[in-house]
Amino acid sequence: ALNTAKLYGAKKVLFVTKLKAISSILKDFEAIQKPFDMYCINYESLHKCESDFDLIILDESHCLGQYPQPAERVKELKRICTDKPIIYLSGTPTPESYSQFYHQFYISSFSPFAEKKFYEWHKNYGIPALKFLYNRQINDYSKTKKEAVLEKVQHLILSYTQEEAGFTSF
């Protein structure tokens, strides 16, 4: 992602990640000889962030996929990311359901989905279902029309195996 930012010609990059990953990212940034200004922050500190970046990198972006309501960090990112290019990084972009794509892309002005609210999105891409939770019947928003969702997002996704990405097994 850092090399992509360099190739893009970014001048000021916001890199959002988990707290424990910040030191590793800063080390990688040193290795590419700091070709741009970078602000590396964890998701819990987004409220301190301005929106004057020309590129946003979101590590572990699957953590933005809560539904049906957006998490506070998603609302903060929507404010920061308006009209900005975003690079999403995740080993598991939809660990539980394709519904998790909605809020990941919701923060982008360039979302492949036209729907402004999750419930509108689910009417088009979801499969109505119910589930029981604590002896109560509630809507289950995890069921989706997988092919329809993938048709919208597939052109935005690059997939690599661990081996292709340079990771080795022990």
Task: Give the ranges of each region predicted by the language model.
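Catalytic P-loop NTPase motifs of RecA-like helicase/translocase cores
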Residues: C63-P68, P95-E96
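Inter-Walker segment of RecA-like/P-loop motor cores
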Residues: I32-K48
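Residues at the starts of beta-strands that form the adenosine-phosphate
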Residues: K12, D37, P85
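Conserved P-loop NTPase motor "coupling/switch" region that bridges the ATPase
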Residues: L55, R73-E164
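Hydrophobic "anchor" residues on beta-strands that sit immediately upstream
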Residues: L14, M38, L55-I56
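Walker B catalytic acidic pair
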Residues: D59-E60
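Conserved Walker A/P-loop ATP-binding site and its immediately adjacent core
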Residues: L2-N3, Y8-F29, E96-Q100
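Short, glycine/charged-enriched secondary-structure capping and boundary segments
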Residues: L2-T4, D28-A31, F53, P70-V74, ...
